[in-house]
A protein has these predicted regions:
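Conserved ABC ATPase "signature" region
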Residues: 108, 122-139
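Helix-to-loop junction immediately C-terminal to a conserved catalytic motif
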Residues: 59
Length: 265
């Protein structure tokens, strides 16, 4: 039986976090939210709302102007770069791996923060598990350059799994993937049970994937809660300019959210 979110320990906590951009204009303003261990949190909002900025803060690529961030009870800014690499993995949009690497070699890069370029027996087992969990064992000897876009994204996810982080960050991981590959990728993350903060644009994928949703607009946290709360019709209309409604699945009766863009005139 899955433990309820409310009883799990807090993994990530942001308290009144702000980030200033050019001319001191706020890129993030007074963001406070938390994630429980094992939670999947979807971060959504229109372009320019601060989603990628928040990820860059969590990877310490950007510093905060005010506020603090704790990861597993420790101040994030107290951790060395090496220690952060052990604890936080990111699947970035602009990942450009060496396409001459074989899949298993690429996945093994996830162990570097822990043991450098040596590969002890336990690391080899973790790499095998990551390949297996992502369905890549049959492709382990293939060159990255010969993979499809979906297969290459799964390889990047396997590398992140092999890193065994406390927190997985996904920056629009389903971009450029076909519908089946999108659903499969998020399903792999869900089955792994890893604490995940994912920037997502594909609204229909959010409810099946996320435990909670944080909605950003113009650098502020507009709404934070369950998918039903965060993706209410009024919020979707206000933030994305789209209509939304709920229908029942024709086979199992579960609720399905439908999002509809207004016609252009």
């Amino acid at each position: 039986m899955t433990e309820p979110l409310s009883t799990r320990p807090v993994l990530l906590q942001l308290h009144h976090v702000s980030v200033a951009g050019a001319n001191r204009a706020p890129r993030l303003s007074n963001i406070s939210l938390s994630m429980q261990a094992g939670e999947r949190l979807a971060l959504i909002g229109p372009n320019g709302s601060g989603k990628s900025t928040l990820l860059r803060v969590l990877t310490s690529e950007l510093g905060t102007t005010t506020g603090y961030i704790h990861l597993n009870g420790q101040p994030l800014n107290s951790l060395s770069r090496h220690e952060r690499a052990k604890r936080i993995a990111i699947l970035a949009q602009n990942d450009t791996p060496d396409l001459r690497l074989r899949v298993a070699e690429y996945v093994a890069l996830g162990r570097i923060p822990h043991h450098g370029f040596s590969t002890p027996a336990n690391d080899r087992q973790l790499i095998e598990e990551a390949l297996d969990d992502t369905g890549l064992l049959p492709l382990r000897h293939r060159l990255l350059g010969t993979l499809s876009g979906g297969e290459r994204q799964r390889a990047a996810l396997a590398r992140a799994f092999a890193q065994t982080p406390q927190l997985l960050l996904l920056d629009e991981p389903t971009n450029h993937l076909d519908p089946l590959a999108r659903a499969q990728l998020l399903s792999l993350v869900r089955k792994r049970g890893i604490s995940t903060l994912a920037v997502l644009h594909d609204l229909p994928l959010i409810t099946p994937f996320a435990d909670r949703v944080a909605v950003l607009q113009q650098g502020t946290l507009l709404r934070w809660g369950t998918p039903a709360h965060a993706l209410s019709a009024d919020c979707v209309k206000s933030v994305f300019g789209m209509e939304s409604f709920t229908v029942s699945h024709p086979i199992n009766g579960s609720p399905i959210r439908i999002f509809e863009a207004p016609e252009l005139h």
